[in-house]
Amino acid sequence: MKQGIHPKYEQVTASCSCGNVIKINSTVGHDLNLDVCGECHPFYTGKQRDVASGGRVDRFNKRFSVPGAKK
């Protein structure tokens, strides 16, 4: 590597709003404040909700379906 052209790589602290503190290496140069992390994000904790409640086709079929009709 060439000397003097790369940014300084140092250890910084990333603090999440849930209280989790992570020490990482970065070129940012200052401590980071995070909104979500792997400890509190709904995808990783398993507390996610299914937001897809059907699309336009499902709504159309529900509105115009005939009760007792064959599919």
Curated annotation (Swiss-Prot):
Zn(2+) binds at C16, C18, C37, C40. Its cofactor is Zn(2+). GO terms for molecular function: metal ion binding; rRNA binding; structural constituent of ribosome. Binds the 23S rRNA. This is Large ribosomal subunit protein bL31. Binds 1 zinc ion per subunit. One of its GO terms (biological process) is translation. GO terms for cellular component: ribonucleoprotein complex; ribosome.
